Amino acid sequence: MQLIPTSIPEVVILEPRLFRDERGYFFESFSEQRFAELVAPTHFVQDNESRSSYGVVRGLHFQLPPHAQAKLVRVLRGRVLDVAVDVRLGSPTFGQHVAVELTEDNHRMLFLPHGFAHGFSVLSEEAVFQYKCDNYYAPEAEGAIAWDDPALGINWGLPAEAIRLSAKDSKHPRLSEAPQLFNYSTTLHL
């Protein structure tokens, strides 16, 4: 597995080493020891999976302390544009985002530490998406910002007429209006 940096140092891409032959392929999708060597010691406690169809945009979600979640995400089937937005007040990259294409063919994973809002858009007919989280889901700690906040300038890779949102995701506040965010001084710095 190799680490690929992004424009925000704490958000990193992980690319596994594939072994291919006439039967197909094999790769180690996760090793806690290797992850700690490359990124940081992290103990994931919950795996989630979602299935979505073309045009779906999910996000931008996060959980607030003490229930904050770091996530390691990947696509099992299909193709998505995965987005991480820095929501750490005082961070030199506050309000900036990283957008990475994750596919069933590139097998890449994206790591988002505490202090980042997460979302993705589905670019294929269907996508099956997996999240590893270092904290359990806590509905009372849910936070979110608007997927289409003009201050973020996110290009979701979809025509406007194709975008499909849940009722909940269509009502999130802009980053500047979010009632609670993270403090940069209390989050992981790589």
PLM-predicted stretches and their roles:
Residues 1-108, 124-126, 131-190:
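Non-catalytic, conserved peripheral segments adjacent to functional cores
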Residues 110, 118-123:
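Short beta-strand His + acidic residue motifs that chelate non-heme Fe in jelly-roll/DSBH
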